[in-house]
């Protein structure tokens, strides 16, 4: 308020000085202009009347009154007598006696001399006598000098006043500017109603914003009634809230925290008069943060961290606490896609004006970086070895390597002592741990740093501490490599033995499978029949790749393939064989024909039996399907790895001078491993020779080693065969269902002898018999003749 008053007075003073200067300037100019104007007119008029006469100056009387020509009555231009302005004889010098200066401009002007007036010779000569004896230039009258002095003083006074006024206004402006700067940085001198529009508090149950009155007039007449603003403001500390008594409607609402950089004024006594504004503080570049005026909160319970005042926020983005001036607690970042300029028509415009509040203290305890080593009650965690801050550890090895090793140690639940004992004594450890240790072995530089470290081990991380203990053991990682070989060799040997055994069984079963050979025979004969008359006919053998092409040749119906035909023929052939086994008679076909059951039920049973036999080929050659997934190159690589690891272990055993449990365990292992490896090597060579002979048995000798390709071909053919058998089985069920209906219609013909079942299965045999009977009849007929 005082600042505004001073500004108002300064502006008023400037206006007053400007008006005064204008008035004085106009008055002085009028006087000067009046005097000069009269003199100029008089001189110009006289010169005009007497252009060739020499002027005679009269002392102090050469002052022509302006009203003679300027303010006198205008001459009449009507016809009649009037003053003559034509050139004529110069007037007598004494004629200037009547031109005395007027006493004041308000007096009536002197009359103009007329022709009827008496001659100038009759006037008193005492007035002009002195002037006739002293000719010379006229002197300026004293009245003019006096006016010049007054004008000069007036100009000096106006200029001085203007300069002083400018200096005063400049000083006032500088004082006000410095005062504003101090108020913007430091504490306030008086109360101001510059509170935020939205009032928030920690424990507020009414989440409604209080809008401060923005139309308060600071220079209104009613400012005297609001002079005691400080007396009407009370700062009450209740937990983390401040309350104001400025309006009855906002009495129950907790206010916001004070803006950053400002402190609350001290509460004045209730009956005390309004305090005078203190003098402005000296300007400071950066004043310290103001102390808290409110009383401190009650002492927190033991072990709990003191709460900060104003622990709620509605999205304050400031990095500095508005009360203490200290930086806010650093929280974990939340990565999102920030929108640059949201439109006012969007939903965010309404959300920004909401009344949502959150507990800032709880948020800092959950997502703060500094509280990671404290639990919910603020107490330190009991398991300090697992929850120590990684910033306290000394980092020696790679960060990712240390992290992976620490996770593995916790996952396997293996202590450092157990690992050290196993390395020193040759005990068994998890294979995964040993493999990870070899992969994450420190480099030569890291190992040197670990060896040279002589500080406290607790200052190292779990991974560095573990590796520090390991590098102190002689040949630690060579021991780990040998220990891994000792543990994994038995498993690798078992896998190799199983694979080699599978290959041997597959070769034997494939060569000794009667049904598989029957299939090859059927395919060979069928193919030769189809290739009659071509260069492909009369084949004696074919490669097993041909088996995979049987399903590509389709019949005239577009459904039945050559593979279907071969399978049906094999089923019929196996049905006949099943009949032979049941009759236990292998003497001749005629005996079988006479003793066989020719009923339709028996025929169907034989057909289903043949289908089961063909379907069982897949089960019979199951080892061939397992042998197809074995990689011959993988077998050779595994044997090579075993040989290399065994060589390294033997060389490492030679470098160990002192006897220890690990040295004795390694020596015994190498002795057993040599015997196992020799047997595996011999067995692998024998099995591979058997595989090659089997491939030559079916494919013939080839220039290149096909390896285990034979088993892959047979596996694919068995898959195709199994699919065709399922289709034939489904077709047989449909045929049987329709055959039952036909049997019911032929019950009347049951007395007639049914044809032989072999004729039904093999109609070609019946035709041959009919042909043979006809030939015999012809021979009998021709013989008597």
From Swiss-Prot:
SUPFAM superfamilies: Formin homology 2 domain (FH2 domain). Residues 96-145, 184-228, 241-329, 730-785 are annotated as: Disordered. Belongs to the formin-like family. Class-I subfamily. GO terms for biological process: actin cytoskeleton organization; actin nucleation. GO terms for molecular function: actin filament binding. InterPro entries: FH2_Formin, FH2_Formin_sf, Formin-like_plant. Its main location: membrane. It is a single-pass membrane protein. Residues 201-223, 745-754 have a biased composition (Polar residues). It comes from Arabidopsis thaliana (Mouse-ear cress). Disulfide bonds: none annotated. Acts as actin nucleation factor that directs the formation of actin cables and polarized growth in pollen tubes. Residues 115-134 have a biased composition (Low complexity). This is Formin-like protein 3. Residues 256-303 have a biased composition (Pro residues).
């Amino acid at each position: 308020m005082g600042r505004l008053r001073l500004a108002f007075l300064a502006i008023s003073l400037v206006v007053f000085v400007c008006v005064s200067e204008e008035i004085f300037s106009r008055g002085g100019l009028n006087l000067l202009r009046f005097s000069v104007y009269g003199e100029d007119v008089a001189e110009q008029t006289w010169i005009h009347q007497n252009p060739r006469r020499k002027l005679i100056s009269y002392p102090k009387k050469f002052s022509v009154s302006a009203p003679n020509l300027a303010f006198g009555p205008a001459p009449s231009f009507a016809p009649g007598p009037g003053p003559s302005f034509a050139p004529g004889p110069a007037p007598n010098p004494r004629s200037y006696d009547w031109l005395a200066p007027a006493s004041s401009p308000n007096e009536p002007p002197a009359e103009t001399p007329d022709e009827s007036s008496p001659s100038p010779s009759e006037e008193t000569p005492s007035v002009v006598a002195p002037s006739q004896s002293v000719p010379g230039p006229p002197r300026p009258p004293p009245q003019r000098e006096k006016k010049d002095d007054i004008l000069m003083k007036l100009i000096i006074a106006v200029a001085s006043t203007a300069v002083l006024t400018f200096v005063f206004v400049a000083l006032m402006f500088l004082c006000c500017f410095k005062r504003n700067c101090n108020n913007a940085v430091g504490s306030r001198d008086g109360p101001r109603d510059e509170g935020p529009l939205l009032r928030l508090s920690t424990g507020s149950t009414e989440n409604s914003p209080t809008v401060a009155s923005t139309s308060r007039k600071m220079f209104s007449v009613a400012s005297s009634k609001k002079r005691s603003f400080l007396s009407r403001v009370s700062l009450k500390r209740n937990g983390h809230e401040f309350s104001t008594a400025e309006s009855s409607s906002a009495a129950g609402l907790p206010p916001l925290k004070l803006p950053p950089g400002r402190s609350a004024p001290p509460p004045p006594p209730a009956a005390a008069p309004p305090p005078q504004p203190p003098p402005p503080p000296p300007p400071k570049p950066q004043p310290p943060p103001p102390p808290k005026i409110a009383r401190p909160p009650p002492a927190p319970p033991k072990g709990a961290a003191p709460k900060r005042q104003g622990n709620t926020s509605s999205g304050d983005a400031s990095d500095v606490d508005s009360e203490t001036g200290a930086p806010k607690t650093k929280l974990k970042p939340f990565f999102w896609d920030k929108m640059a300029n949201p439109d006012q028509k969007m939903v965010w415009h309404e959300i920004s004006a909401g009344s949502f509040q959150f507990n800032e203290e709880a948020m800092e305890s959950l997502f703060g970086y500094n509280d990671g080593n404290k639990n919910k009650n603020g107490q330190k965690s009991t398991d300090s070895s697992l929850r120590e801050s990684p910033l306290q550890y000394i980092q020696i090895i790679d960060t990712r390597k240390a992290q992976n090793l620490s996770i593995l140690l916790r996952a396997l639940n293996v202590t450092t002592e157990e690992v050290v004992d196993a390395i020193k004594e040759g005990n068994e450890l998890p294979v995964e741990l040993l493999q990870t240790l070899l992969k994450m072995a420190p480099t030569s530089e890291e190992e040197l740093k670990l060896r040279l470290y002589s500080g406290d081990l607790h200052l190292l991380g779990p991974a560095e501490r573990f590796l520090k203990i390991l590098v102190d053991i002689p040949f630690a990682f060579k021991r780990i490599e040998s220990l891994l070989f000792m543990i994994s060799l038995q498993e690798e040997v078992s896998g190799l033995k199983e694979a080699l055994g599978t290959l041997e069984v597959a070769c034997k079963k494939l060569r000794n499978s009667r049904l598989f050979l029957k299939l090859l025979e059927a395919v060979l004969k069928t193919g030769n029949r189809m290739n009659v008359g071509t260069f492909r006919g009369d084949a004696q053998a074919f490669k097993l790749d041909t088996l995979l092409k049987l399903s590509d040749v389709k019949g005239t119906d577009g459904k039945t393939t050559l593979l279907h035909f071969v399978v049906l023929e094999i089923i019929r052939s196996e049905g006949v064989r099943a009949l032979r086994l049941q009759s236990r008679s292998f003497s001749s076909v005629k005996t079988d024909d006479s003793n066989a059951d020719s009923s339709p039920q028996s025929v169907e049973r034989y057909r289903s039996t043949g289908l089961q036999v063909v379907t069982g080929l897949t089960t019979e050659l199951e080892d061939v399907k397992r042998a197809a997934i074995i990689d011959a190159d993988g077998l050779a690589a595994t044997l090579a790895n075993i040989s290399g690891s065994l060589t390294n272990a033997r060389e490492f055993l030679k470098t160990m001078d002192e006897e220890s449990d690990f040295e004795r365990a390694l020596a015994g292992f190498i002795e057993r491993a040599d015997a196992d490896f020799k047997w595996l090597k011999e067995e692998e060579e024998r099995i591979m020779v058997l595989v090659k002979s089997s491939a030559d048995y079916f494919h013939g000798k080839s220039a290149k080693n096909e390896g285990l390709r034979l088993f892959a071909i047979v596996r694919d053919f068995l898959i195709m065969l199994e699919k065709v058998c399922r289709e034939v089985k489904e077709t047989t069920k449909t045929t049987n269902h329709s055959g039952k209906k036909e049997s019911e219609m032929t019950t009347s013909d049951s007395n007639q002898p049914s044809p032989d079942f072999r004729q039904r299965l093999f109609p070609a045999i019946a035709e041959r018999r009919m042909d043979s009977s006809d030939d015999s009849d012809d021979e009998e007929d021709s013989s008597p003749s």
